Amino acid sequence: MAGTIAEENADRATFETDQGVGVPVALGEGLDWYAGKPNRISSVVHRDEAQLNPGQNSRTLAMIEAVMSAAPSMGQKTALVLKDNAGVALPEAPWLLGAQGPAILEVWFPGQEDGNIVADLLFGKVNPSGKAPVTFPIAGRSFLDALAPEAYPGVLEEGKAAVSYLEGRYMGYRWYDGNRGGGCALQPNGENPCVAFPFGHGLSYTMFSLTPFAQRWENGVLKLETTVTNRGDREGAEVVQVYFGLSEPGQPPKRLVAFQRVALAPGEARLVTLSLDPEASHHPFDVFDDVTKAFRPAAGPIKVYLGTSSSLRDLRAQSLLAREE
């Protein structure tokens, strides 16, 4: 199945008559971008969204669920195209996430070439190779409001709405890695139960494999090497990502320090080398000292992660090779 439903027509086409693809049901949270209070990604699951958005419930999730429930094989024939400006909280539902759900294509706000871009991706003229620059969390689990109302959704200060950035160093994917809101302890396979799609995640119409990586120091610069192989029958690109885990107290479990995109023909293999210079401007080996207000070398051992997303499921880990003097 291929097609689009304009947002302004979604309610009418789907819910005004019994001949549509569904009937009115209570909407979940997260994908309802055009309601009066959009994108409610909260640790509290809002069962009655109509109370939050009286008369403006776009029923986006209910529409998707109705379409996906039309036939057992619908998930293999449906693509959900997201056009938005940020990560979206997704409900933990088999009709949306997993093998029975649709293919999900995040195109952000593509501009005037919207139609051409989406068509080229859906019909395979272009092979997707992007990686998520944000976390797509599961709705109702350990969002920032678990920290304090001042962090999310904000409070009134002198009559004006104000949000305080209380998460400190645990911004973005680090928040979920560090389980700062509770309830997000990693599963045995490395997956985070609060995350639908992790930072750095992105699929393709082909498949890639990475060999175990090697480390070496060269002229004071750390070199990480892995061989990436395109094991599918389509040309495509993978993004190799490197994270450092610092053992110093107060630091997130890991942070992105390097990445490199590699485009490969079907069956092609290529050695990829990522360089990490201790003197680089993003200070990969350092921490910021709140007392001295300056960067300094991190105390304790460093763990090196290399893979294809921020999820431990997609990473290999090694202890940092001692620097040659």
Q: Language-model segments: what does each one mean?
A:
Residues 1-325:
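C-terminal non-catalytic regions of proteins with extracellular/luminal or membrane-system context
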